[in-house]
Amino acid sequence: MRCLQVFIIFLLLIPSPPSVDAQRKTKDDVPLASFHDNAKRTLKRLWNKRSCCPREFLCCLR
């Protein structure tokens, strides 16, 4: 059973062939930078909610 787990981990480590992202960009493609900015903004907002003080409940509502 342990060999099966090791085998699955090795399969996950094998590099995969180029995906759809490797295709040429068209004029309709949205740059990934906007997605990364949105993700960073969301994570920052969630982090601020997590680190706010219980006495200052209003900081959690932003």
UniProtKB/Swiss-Prot annotation:
Keyword tags: Cleavage on pair of basic residues, Disulfide bond, Secreted, Signal, Toxin
Post-translational modification: Contains 2 disulfide bonds that can be either 'C1-C3, C2-C4' or 'C1-C4, C2-C3', since these disulfide connectivities have been observed for conotoxins with cysteine framework V (for examples, see AC P0DQQ7 and AC P81755).
GO annotation, cellular component aspect: extracellular region
GO MF annotation terms: toxin activity
Proregion span(s): 23-48
InterPro entries to which the protein is assigned, alphabetical: T-conotoxin
Presence of keyword Protease: no
Entry comment describing in which tissues the protein is expressed: Expressed by the venom duct.
UniProt-annotated location(s): Secreted
Keyword Signal: yes
Superkingdom per UniProt: Eukaryota
Pfam families per UniProt: Chi-conotoxin (PF16981)
Signal peptide from the UniProt entry: 1-22
Family: Belongs to the conotoxin T superfamily.
Domain notes: The cysteine framework is V (CC-CC).
Name of the protein in its database record: Conotoxin Lt5.5
Species this protein is from: Conus litteratus
